[in-house]
Curated annotation (Swiss-Prot):
EC number: 5.3.1.15
Signal peptide range in chain numbering: none
Annotated protein name in UniProt: D-lyxose ketol-isomerase
One matching Pfam family: Lyx_isomer
Amino acid sequence: MRGTEWREARDRVAEMFRKAGIALTPSELEKVEVADFGLGNLAVQGLQLVTYINTDRYCAKELALFPHQTCPEHLHPPVGGDPGKMETFRCRWGKVFLYVEGEPAASVQAAVPPGSEAYYTVFHEIVLTPGEQYTIPPGTKHWFQGGPEGAIVSEFSSTSRDEFDIFTDPKVERMPVIEFDD
Protein backbone atom coordinates (compact mmCIF):
# COMPACT_ATOMS: atom_id res chain seq x y z
CA MET A 1 0.00 0.00 0.00
CA ARG A 2 1.28 3.46 -0.88
CA GLY A 3 1.61 6.15 1.76
CA THR A 4 -0.89 8.35 -0.09
CA GLU A 5 -3.52 5.58 0.13
CA TRP A 6 -2.85 5.24 3.88
CA ARG A 7 -3.24 9.01 4.39
CA GLU A 8 -6.48 9.11 2.38
CA ALA A 9 -7.90 6.21 4.41
CA ARG A 10 -6.80 7.84 7.68
CA ASP A 11 -8.52 11.09 6.67
CA ARG A 12 -11.74 9.19 5.83
CA VAL A 13 -11.55 7.46 9.22
CA ALA A 14 -11.14 10.83 10.97
CA GLU A 15 -14.28 12.10 9.22
CA MET A 16 -16.25 8.96 10.14
CA PHE A 17 -15.31 9.33 13.81
CA ARG A 18 -16.23 13.03 13.72
CA LYS A 19 -19.66 12.18 12.25
CA ALA A 20 -20.13 9.48 14.88
CA GLY A 21 -19.22 11.88 17.71
CA ILE A 22 -16.28 9.70 18.83
CA ALA A 23 -13.24 11.75 19.82
CA LEU A 24 -9.76 10.64 18.80
CA THR A 25 -6.59 12.46 19.77
CA PRO A 26 -4.16 13.67 17.09
CA SER A 27 -1.76 10.95 18.29
CA GLU A 28 -4.41 8.25 17.80
CA LEU A 29 -5.18 9.54 14.30
CA GLU A 30 -1.48 9.36 13.40
CA LYS A 31 -1.45 5.71 14.48
CA VAL A 32 -4.52 4.53 12.53
CA GLU A 33 -3.72 1.09 11.14
CA VAL A 34 -4.90 0.69 7.57
CA ALA A 35 -4.94 -2.97 6.54
CA ASP A 36 -5.46 -3.97 2.92
CA PHE A 37 -4.47 -7.54 3.84
CA GLY A 38 -1.96 -7.58 0.99
CA LEU A 39 -4.83 -7.93 -1.47
CA GLY A 40 -4.39 -4.48 -3.02
CA ASN A 41 -8.06 -3.45 -2.98
CA LEU A 42 -8.64 -1.61 0.29
CA ALA A 43 -12.13 -0.40 -0.62
CA VAL A 44 -13.34 -3.99 -1.06
CA GLN A 45 -11.29 -6.04 1.41
CA GLY A 46 -9.72 -3.98 4.16
CA LEU A 47 -10.08 -2.60 7.66
CA GLN A 48 -8.99 0.47 9.59
CA LEU A 49 -8.13 0.11 13.29
CA VAL A 50 -7.33 2.31 16.26
CA THR A 51 -5.81 0.37 19.15
CA TYR A 52 -6.31 2.07 22.52
CA ILE A 53 -4.58 -0.62 24.57
CA ASN A 54 -3.29 -4.16 24.07
CA THR A 55 -1.69 -5.89 27.05
CA ASP A 56 -1.17 -9.47 28.13
CA ARG A 57 -4.62 -9.31 29.77
CA TYR A 58 -6.96 -7.31 27.53
CA CYS A 59 -7.34 -5.19 24.42
CA ALA A 60 -9.58 -2.31 23.28
CA LYS A 61 -9.86 -1.10 19.68
CA GLU A 62 -12.10 0.78 17.32
CA LEU A 63 -12.68 -0.85 13.93
CA ALA A 64 -13.72 1.39 11.06
CA LEU A 65 -15.26 -0.08 7.91
CA PHE A 66 -15.92 1.99 4.81
CA PRO A 67 -19.22 1.37 2.96
CA HIS A 68 -19.41 -2.31 1.95
CA GLN A 69 -15.76 -2.86 2.95
CA THR A 70 -15.09 -6.42 4.14
CA CYS A 71 -12.67 -7.81 6.70
CA PRO A 72 -11.79 -11.25 5.25
CA GLU A 73 -12.75 -14.51 6.95
CA HIS A 74 -10.35 -15.55 9.71
CA LEU A 75 -10.07 -17.03 13.18
CA HIS A 76 -7.96 -16.37 16.25
CA PRO A 77 -6.15 -19.61 17.12
CA PRO A 78 -4.69 -20.79 20.42
CA VAL A 79 -1.25 -19.31 21.09
CA GLY A 80 0.85 -21.08 23.70
CA GLY A 81 -1.41 -21.65 26.71
CA ASP A 82 -3.96 -19.05 25.55
CA PRO A 83 -7.12 -20.49 23.91
CA GLY A 84 -7.20 -17.66 21.35
CA LYS A 85 -8.74 -14.21 21.31
CA MET A 86 -12.31 -13.81 22.55
CA GLU A 87 -13.77 -10.56 21.29
CA THR A 88 -16.95 -8.56 21.68
CA PHE A 89 -18.01 -6.31 18.82
CA ARG A 90 -20.25 -3.37 19.78
CA CYS A 91 -21.59 -1.29 16.91
CA ARG A 92 -21.17 2.42 17.61
CA TRP A 93 -22.17 3.91 14.26
CA GLY A 94 -23.58 2.65 10.96
CA LYS A 95 -24.37 -1.01 10.40
CA VAL A 96 -22.15 -4.09 10.35
CA PHE A 97 -22.93 -7.51 8.93
CA LEU A 98 -21.07 -10.15 10.96
CA TYR A 99 -20.80 -13.78 9.85
CA VAL A 100 -19.77 -16.61 12.16
CA GLU A 101 -19.95 -20.39 12.28
CA GLY A 102 -23.46 -21.77 12.77
CA GLU A 103 -26.72 -22.15 10.87
CA PRO A 104 -26.35 -20.20 7.59
CA ALA A 105 -28.76 -17.36 6.88
CA ALA A 106 -31.38 -18.13 4.22
CA SER A 107 -30.44 -14.90 2.45
CA VAL A 108 -27.14 -13.17 3.24
CA GLN A 109 -27.35 -9.36 3.31
CA ALA A 110 -23.64 -8.70 2.71
CA ALA A 111 -21.94 -9.22 -0.64
CA VAL A 112 -18.99 -11.61 -0.72
CA PRO A 113 -16.13 -9.86 -2.57
CA PRO A 114 -16.13 -10.99 -6.24
CA GLY A 115 -13.40 -13.50 -7.00
CA SER A 116 -13.01 -14.44 -3.33
CA GLU A 117 -16.12 -16.60 -2.92
CA ALA A 118 -14.07 -19.74 -2.13
CA TYR A 119 -12.60 -18.00 0.93
CA TYR A 120 -15.89 -17.12 2.61
CA THR A 121 -17.32 -20.25 4.22
CA VAL A 122 -19.39 -19.17 7.24
CA PHE A 123 -22.77 -17.48 6.84
CA HIS A 124 -24.54 -17.39 10.21
CA GLU A 125 -25.58 -13.74 10.06
CA ILE A 126 -25.62 -11.22 12.89
CA VAL A 127 -26.60 -7.66 11.97
CA LEU A 128 -25.38 -5.04 14.43
CA THR A 129 -26.70 -1.49 14.62
CA PRO A 130 -25.62 1.17 17.15
CA GLY A 131 -25.80 -0.16 20.70
CA GLU A 132 -25.93 -3.83 19.71
CA GLN A 133 -23.09 -6.23 20.42
CA TYR A 134 -22.00 -9.81 19.85
CA THR A 135 -19.24 -11.91 21.43
CA ILE A 136 -17.14 -14.17 19.20
CA PRO A 137 -15.62 -17.16 21.03
CA PRO A 138 -11.95 -18.07 20.50
CA GLY A 139 -11.18 -20.17 17.43
CA THR A 140 -14.40 -19.19 15.62
CA LYS A 141 -14.23 -18.40 11.90
CA HIS A 142 -15.76 -15.00 11.19
CA TRP A 143 -15.84 -12.14 8.71
CA PHE A 144 -17.66 -8.83 8.64
CA GLN A 145 -18.71 -6.06 6.28
CA GLY A 146 -19.73 -2.44 6.70
CA GLY A 147 -23.23 -1.41 5.68
CA PRO A 148 -24.17 1.31 3.15
CA GLU A 149 -22.69 4.12 5.31
CA GLY A 150 -19.86 2.02 6.68
CA ALA A 151 -19.53 1.25 10.38
CA ILE A 152 -17.57 1.92 13.52
CA VAL A 153 -17.30 -1.02 15.89
CA SER A 154 -15.73 -1.05 19.34
CA GLU A 155 -13.82 -4.25 20.01
CA PHE A 156 -13.24 -5.42 23.57
CA SER A 157 -11.15 -8.57 23.76
CA SER A 158 -8.54 -10.69 25.39
CA THR A 159 -4.99 -10.05 24.19
CA SER A 160 -4.77 -9.38 20.46
CA ARG A 161 -2.09 -11.28 18.57
CA ASP A 162 -3.13 -10.37 15.03
CA GLU A 163 0.09 -11.75 13.56
CA PHE A 164 -1.17 -15.27 14.43
CA ASP A 165 -4.63 -14.89 12.84
CA ILE A 166 -5.48 -17.66 10.38
CA PHE A 167 -7.20 -16.43 7.23
CA THR A 168 -9.17 -18.70 4.92
CA ASP A 169 -7.60 -16.97 1.91
CA PRO A 170 -3.90 -17.96 1.82
CA LYS A 171 -3.03 -14.74 -0.06
CA VAL A 172 -3.93 -12.57 2.95
CA GLU A 173 -1.07 -10.83 4.73
CA ARG A 174 -2.37 -9.57 8.06
CA MET A 175 0.36 -7.10 8.91
CA PRO A 176 0.21 -4.11 6.51
CA VAL A 177 3.23 -2.92 4.58
CA ILE A 178 3.14 0.79 3.74
CA GLU A 179 5.51 2.30 1.18
CA PHE A 180 5.76 6.01 1.89
CA ASP A 181 6.42 7.94 -1.27
CA ASP A 182 7.49 11.19 0.33
